[in-house]
């Protein structure tokens, strides 16, 4: 949002931590519309139905939903990135670094986005270490430091020595550092500062350029209500720099795979209905 404001000079505003509830979202969105805002970004999956309904009710407002799948032909689109690509790369690092062959994954909700990310990560793990397993614990929250800490500690108690996450707090990393384990973060802000001794790398987002592109298309009357899914070739998703703890051979492999993904010559498999065979857990908890 700040990148968008800096690059375009347009006025932006935001509200954080709106519950995934249609009434709550509608209250906030309608308040913005009444103030004259005519582009509404909803950045949580749970806003899907409310945004679809509001797009019909407010045809002069553009609604853009992050991580969803609904759209119309005029004023409602969705956008997301192929986060499974850098998650696969981070799995290569995790598989090479585990000594116990037990890797833990603290995950929010069993939805397709999260499941395909876990499977892509586990694909990377398996490529470099066929003996390693990835055990998943669900927290049922995107941001819940206490629940994340409990899940991380439960995994660590089983002998896990590398933790990964699909969560919005650094609690998993803090638990990993306290136990002497390694940590694959999620977004750089939760990485080196929160648990520098555990941090290895992180799949990361860079939303700014996309926001500028889509808003400029609206300003120029070139907007198309589409389902946008950008991969590593767009810069929307990437793998943060590796620490020196990652073995040189593995770092070289990650570099090669990164080039292959960007060029289009390789793409990790997308599996989101069930877990692949080296994952311990269930998609229907």
Language-model segment annotations:
Residues 1-285:
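A residue-level marker of the well-folded mature domains of exported/periplasmic proteins
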